[in-house]
């Protein structure tokens, strides 16, 4: 009898360990996009000296989607930025696509008279129209034989001076790779030619703790209505990594680090990162239920 009880307990431990290992493994679907800001893709042409870059990761979290992003801009009054939006997919010089999200930024965002550097994250609820749309669009836009060969997600930046309807800069986001998905299609340049940048790493731990993330399907409110606290960058077609370095890990959710020793700039891919903490928290109730169920079966036997 004692042997049977010991064997039962041993089986329970194996079952729980296996369940825990599957539940907490880092198997989140992640799609990575990168782009540079400029004026050439704007619907209404503008001339300015804004330079910068953008990183975006779309991850599957708890049945919905989480957008983690960062932008770095120079040549713009960061305190004048009124609104940053994620839109598309659409070809350059056109407005289109059903995705329309206003992006909030976290407290580490740097706003000065010459630059805007910041990042954040936003969640889209499961079973929402936006969530369904994103799911299908990701399949289409990341396929090598995609109908979206000339269309991408894009980010626009508006200022108080120019107005919300007149973005001063735009970044077409090129698909660079994915992880834990059956789809490993290639990205496409805005001109339609195939040119896939190197795949970047996973979401950093700072992205999963952003206090400004939203769990609703609608877009969050724009950054503050006062020029002193609202984030908004302008752009040109080249990135300026040398002047945009800060100590914040949220600047590059794609895991890209830049170093500027003298006049040289290098990039290295980060291979570390942590899974969104919400995934672990959401699985705990299930783990407890499974434990109780298995114990009940043992007692009844």
From Swiss-Prot:
One of its GO terms (cellular component) is membrane. Residues 26-279 are extracellular. Glycans are attached at residues 191, 212, 234, 241. The keyword Transmembrane helix applies. Residues 1-25 form the signal peptide. The keyword Magnesium does not apply. Keywords: Glycoprotein, Membrane, Signal, Transmembrane, Transmembrane helix. It comes from Dictyostelium discoideum. It comes from the Eukaryota. This is Uncharacterized transmembrane protein DDB_G0282061. Residues 174-281 are annotated as: Disordered. The chain crosses the membrane at residues 280-300. Residues 301 are cytoplasmic. It is a single-pass type I membrane protein. Residues 204-234, 254-281 have a biased composition (Low complexity). It is found in: Membrane.
């Amino acid at each position: 009898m004692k042997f049977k009880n010991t064997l039962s307990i041993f089986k329970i431990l194996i079952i729980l360990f296996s369940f825990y290992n599957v539940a907490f493994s880092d198997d989140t679907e992640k799609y990575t996009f990168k782009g540079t800001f400029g004026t050439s893709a704007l619907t209404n042409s503008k001339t300015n000296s804004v330079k910068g870059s953008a990183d975006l990761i779309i991850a599957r979290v708890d049945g919905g989607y989480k957008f983690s992003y960062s932008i770095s801009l120079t040549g713009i009054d960061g305190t004048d930025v009124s609104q940053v939006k994620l839109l598309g997919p659409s070809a350059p010089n056109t407005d289109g696509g059903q995705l329309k999200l206003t992006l909030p930024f976290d407290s580490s965002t740097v706003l000065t008279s010459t630059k805007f550097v910041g990042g954040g994250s936003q969640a889209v609820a499961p079973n929402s129209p936006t969530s369904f749309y994103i799911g299908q669009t990701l399949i289409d836009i990341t396929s090598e034989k995609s109908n979206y060969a000339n269309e991408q997600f894009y980010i626009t930046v508006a200022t108080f001076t120019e107005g919300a309807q007149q973005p001063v800069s735009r970044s077409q986001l090129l698909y660079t790779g994915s992880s834990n998905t059956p789809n490993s299609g290639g990205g496409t340049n805005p001109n339609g030619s195939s040119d896939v940048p190197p795949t970047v790493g996973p979401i950093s731990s700072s992205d999963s703790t952003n206090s400004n993330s939203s769990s609703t399907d609608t877009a969050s409110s724009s950054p503050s209505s006062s020029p002193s606290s609202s984030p908004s960058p302008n752009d040109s077609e080249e990135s300026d990594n040398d002047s945009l370095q800060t100590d914040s890990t949220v600047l590059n959710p794609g895991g890209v680090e830049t170093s500027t020793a003298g006049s040289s700039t290098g990039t290295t891919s980060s291979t570390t990162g942590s899974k969104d903490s919400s995934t672990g928290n959401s699985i705990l109730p299930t783990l407890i239920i499974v434990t109780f169920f298995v114990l009940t079966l043992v007692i009844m036997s």
